[in-house]
Swiss-Prot record:
Sequence ranges assigned to domain GIY-YIG in this UniProt record: 14-91
Organism: Chromohalobacter salexigens (strain ATCC BAA-138 / DSM 3043 / CIP 106854 / NCIMB 13768 / 1H11)
InterPro entries: GIY-YIG_endonuc (IPR000305), GIY-YIG_endonuc_sf (IPR035901), GIY-YIG_UvrC_Cho (IPR047296), Hlx-hairpin-Hlx_DNA-bd_motif (IPR003583), RuvA_2-like (IPR010994), UVR_dom (IPR001943), UVR_dom_sf (IPR036876), UvrABC_protein_C (IPR050066)
Protein name, UniProt field: UvrABC system protein C
Domain of life: Bacteria
Length: 604
């Protein structure tokens, strides 16, 4: 793992908030919340961890944090981000097409809230979701059953009950199976549960409050007490703070600037709920004032992209040319856009959050940049170079016993990974398992298109391998006419532990030994690990694609269209394998005879 947790934790706030763990490609692995961010994040990097957490931590390349005022706000934001970004470690690596739903039948007089693996095409009810995970569905179902006493039994059980079950005894069901509740009253509970699941719990609370007052005036104190308990449970659930105000769409921009860099944080609020923060590190090449820089950034942010413009844009500073910017935004949006920097109430709280997040992100980025500069300088000194390199490239090969061989090229400059310059190469025409030939093909394809004067030529080319790979890399550069690029080979030690690598320079007889605490070695390990992860991710995608399609491709009569329909209908090849003949025949374009053919081909 190349992520420097010790260094990162020095920059983290003790405030409550939400954190996002990212992999080498910038994909969100996990979203979590914490009452104290620093303590929670530190717990991932000390002590015994379970297998799942160890697997997660091993893939971390970056952690982004968003500060909130309270833990409740962090919880609300966490759920928003999980539903929006669907990180794999929050959803237990579920396939994209099989996110769970909550289903409410419109055919049953007393419908249950049902767990469904996927949305069915027939219109026999209402689907709520999708939810980010099975756990999220089950927790939501449990909560709605507890508050509104919705039944959770199967229809077949419901039809044959003659007395209430245990769920009624523990006040988690109103026993509609034995007519302890009328159809109209039960439907009202269902409607309230649906409204809560759709995020309209405030409307439910208001209605229940009116019902409670009516019951009290009618001297029905038992009903009033029941409604009071429901209201209290809902209010404990809500605890609405500034992250979920229930009012307004707005984007909020704040700028933090210090010697060495600046950060602009953009908070998006929709329907009163904060959807998250994005951080930008623009270059102030013209040395503009903060007001002018923020104005130019906002203009480019909206007018330079096809982006939704909310009714209100709030800024921490009065913008230069604010009237012009407001007019342009209004014209682009086709409605009047309010541009404000002096705000009160929850808008002022939003703004303070944006300012806090900008400061926090800038602190982290400047610390990272300083550390990276030390690593580049250390590598320069270790390799005895006259100048500090400005660009590194590293290659790695990944395959499974020669299957689906993929080469990766990752790029670092003095600000860190340059992910827009990353490349993958699907290797073809080489013997299975021949890593030398695969590396030669990847290097040739990469550098034959570059000229000696190209600004994207690396100062140092790193290959994951020993003497053989280094020799081959030198031959490729000579063949394509590239000079001036230094070569570095990284051979894993016998135990394959970090810090025990053998490094080879330029010629195979020139080895380099670096202390395990060397910042230069840490840089090499970082880019090597990044190349490895980028390669293995591409390899797995390629391998899975080949395996997924080849199984169905071998079945007579199954072309690309039917193959797509099968995979879409069942959420993947595993679902197709588990389907019965009758279930296969329900797929559009699959006849009963074809279903039998598919079933026999998959099961023999």
């Amino acid at each position: 793992m190349s992520f420097d947790a010790k260094h990162f934790l020095k920059t983290v706030s003790e405030s409550p908030g939400v954190y996002r763990m990212l992999d080498a490609e910038g994909n969100v692995l996990y979203v979590g919340k914490a009452k104290r961010l620093k303590a929670r994040l530190a717990s991932y990097f000390r002590g015994a961890l379970n297998a799942k957490t160890q697997a997660l931590v091993s893939r971390i390349e970056d952690i982004q944090v968003t500060i909130t005022r309270t833990e409740t706000e962090a919880l609300l934001l966490e759920q928003t981000l999980i539903k929006e970004q669907r990180p794999p470690y929050n959803i237990l690596l579920r396939d994209d097409k099989s996110y769970p739903f909550i289903f409410v039948s419109d055919r049953h007089p007393y419908p249950a809230l049902e767990f469904k693996r996927a949305r069915q095409k027939r219109g026999d009810g209402r689907y709520l979701g999708p939810f980010p995970s099975t756990t999220a569905v089950r927790e939501s179902l449990s909560l709605m059953q507890k508050i509104f006493r919705i039944r959770n039994c199967e229809d077949s059980v419901f039809a044959h009950r003659t007395r209430p079950c245990l769920q009624y005894q523990i006040q988690r069901c109103s026993a509609p199976c034995v007519d302890y509740i009328g159809r109209e009253e039960y439907q009202r509970d269902i409607d309230h549960a649906i409204m809560c699941l759709e995020g309209r719990s405030e409307q439910v609370t208001a209605q229940l409050t009116r019902d409670m007052e009516t019951a009290s005036q009618a001297l029905d104190f038992e009903e009033a007490a029941r409604l009071r308990d429901q209201i209290q449970q809902l209010r404990r659930l809500q605890e609405r703070q500034i992250v979920d105000t229930g009012d307004g769409d707005a984007d909020i921009f704040a700028l933090a600037e210090r010697p060495g860099g600046l950060c602009i944080s953009a908070l998006a609020v929709r329907g009163g709920r904060m959807l998250g923060a994005r951080h930008h590190m623009p270059q102030n090449g013209l040395d503009l004032t903060a007001e002018a820089l923020l104005g130019e950034f906002i203009s480019h942010y909206y007018l330079g992209h096809e982006r939704e413009i909310p009714a209100e844009v709030i800024t921490a500073l009065p913008l230069a040319d604010s009237d012009v910017i407001q007019a342009a935004l209004s014209e682009r949006a086709g409605k009047r856009i309010r541009l404000a920097h002096q705000v009160r109430g929850h808008r002022a709280q939003w703004l303070r959050l944006a300012e806090t997040n900008a400061e926090q992100h800038l602190t982290t980025q400047l610390a990272n940049r300083s550390q990276l500069a030390k690593r580049f300088a250390s590598l320069r000194d270790a390799m005895q170079l006259q100048e500090t390199p400005t660009r590194l490239e590293c290659f790695d090969i990944s395959h499974s016993h020669g299957e689906a061989t993929v080469a990766s090229c990752v790029v670092f400059d003095q600000d860190g990974p340059v992910k827009s310059d990353y490349r993958r190469f699907n290797i073809e025409g080489v013997a299975a398992g021949d890593d030398y030939a695969a590396m030669r093909q990847a290097l040739t394809r990469r550098y034959k298109r570059l000229t000696q004067d190209d600004s994207k030529l690396p100062g140092i080319l790193i290959v994951d391998g020993g003497k053989g790979q280094l020799n081959m890399a030198r031959e490729v550069l000579e063949d394509v006419g590239i000079t001036g690029t230094h070569l570095l080979g990284v051979a894993k030690g016998t135990t394959r532990k970090p810090g025990l690598e053998t490094l080879f320079l330029e010629t195979v007889d020139n080895s380099l030994a670096l202390d395990s605490a060397s910042p230069g070695l840490h840089l090499i390990q970082h880019i090597r690990d990044e190349a490895h992860r980028f390669a293995i991710t591409g390899h797995r995608q390629q391998r899975d694609k080949q395996r997924r399609t080849s199984t169905l491709q071998d079945i007579p009569g199954i072309g690309p269209k039917r193959r797509r329909e099968l995979l879409r209908f069942f959420g993947g090849l595993q679902g197709v394998r588990q389907a019965s003949r009758d279930e296969l025949a329900r797929v559009p374009g699959i006849s009963a005879q074809m279903a039998t053919t598919i079933h026999q081909a998959l099961h023999g």
